[in-house]
Amino acid sequence: MSAGPIVERNQDATIYVGGLDEKVSESILWELMVQAGPVVSVNMPKDRVTANHQGFGFVEFMGEEDADYAIKILNMIKLYGKPIKVNKASAHEKNMDVGANIFVGNLDPEVDEKLLYDTFSAFGVILQVPKIMRDVDSGTSKGFAFINFASFEASDTALEAMNGQFLCNRAITVSYAFKRDSKGERHGTAAERMLAAQNPLFPKDRPHQVFSDVPLGVPANTPLAMPGVHAAIAAHATGRPGYQPPPLMGMAQSGYQGQYPPVPPPPPSVTPMPPPMPPTPGMTPRPPPPPSSGMWPPPPPPPPGRTPGPPGMPGMPPPPPPSRFGPPGMGGMPPPPPPGMRYPGGMPPPPPPRYPSAGPGMYPPPPPSRPPAPPSGHGMIPPPPPPS
């Protein structure tokens, strides 16, 4: 199950497994890791004298996605009563250490790595799983641990907030850890802070953030109520550089922004009238406002289906256009000749126009050219005279 040299492995698909009990073998580790994905190789370095493994190993998967999935589901689970640490076995892992390492002392024996991680990850990104120092034989905690943060801002906040606080009914102590290759010098010096500020972690090396980051190109302390920032964010989101979003609430637009100038406010003595609303079907139109002094009120609108008449005859229908051949009822008949003239060619005069049949008990009106007929009987009302 062991593989060749590390350089032959796919480092992106290889994970590191630490905190292994002495009972764990390569076959057991294989059976555990195959639950996350297909395993290519398992390597557990062993001591040359005792031939026992040193408590850690490397597992190579078929792809990087399988390795990431194994880290998510298998990190901090207990194997033979000990929580194991699972993370990426990157060749440049040491370059991620900026020196923001803190020491946590006076821990209760019940405190494990997962509890420390859940407690201190609220202050910032933790690069590695918290390391609790344990007894080699029994595996019990020695009462102190080390936590490596990704920035000094996170470590300073954790030190200030957690020093002297109770964790599992014990007041813990939090301070910067001592350096390994120095004599009594702790982490968090000014030189380390300056070096960390000059060489920040690259985004590809930065672990997953617990909270969402600020959009790229926008400072974290920039208020979104600024006009330029609001337009820049909207243009970046929509992909249209010329897009101008509507102003935010409480903002005053500066300038015309390529539009028409705004309408000036009315003078104090004039009350602006609202624009008329078009009447909806089935509603009575709204009456016009009262006229000003010295002005006649406008005429009322005509009823539906009636056309407005000429001035002086409001509401009356217009007269029909004059017929080309005489009054109504004589359509198709030529006009009579003027008095003293005869029809050409000895033509007889046209017959009188025909009127529609009268109703029962009614007499038809006489022709216009004849005088009214005398009453035909007593008690009868004569017909009205013809129109002049």
Curated annotation (Swiss-Prot):
It comes from the Eukaryota. GO terms for molecular function: RNA binding. CDD domains: RRM1_SF3B4, RRM2_SF3B4. Keywords: mRNA processing, mRNA splicing, Nucleus, Repeat, RNA-binding, Spliceosome. GO terms for biological process: mRNA splicing, via spliceosome. It is found in: Nucleus. Residues 13-91, 100-179 form the RRM domain. GO terms for cellular component: precatalytic spliceosome; U2 snRNP. The keyword Endoplasmic reticulum does not apply. Residues 244-388 are annotated as: Disordered. Residues 261-325, 333-355, 362-388 have a biased composition (Pro residues). Pfam families: RRM_1. InterPro entries: Nucleotide-bd_a/b_plait_sf, RBD_domain_sf, RRM_dom, SF3B4_RRM1, SF3B4_RRM2, SF3B4_spliceosome_assoc. Belongs to the SF3B4 family. Subunit of the splicing factor SF3B required for 'A' complex assembly formed by the stable binding of U2 snRNP to the branchpoint sequence (BPS) in pre-mRNA. Sequence independent binding of SF3A/SF3B complex upstream of the branch site is essential, it may anchor U2 snRNP to the pre-mRNA. May also be involved in the assembly of the 'E' complex. SF3B4 has been found in complex 'B' and 'C' as well. Belongs also to the minor U12-dependent spliceosome, which is involved in the splicing of rare class of nuclear pre-mRNA intron. This is Splicing factor 3B subunit 4. The gene is sap-49.
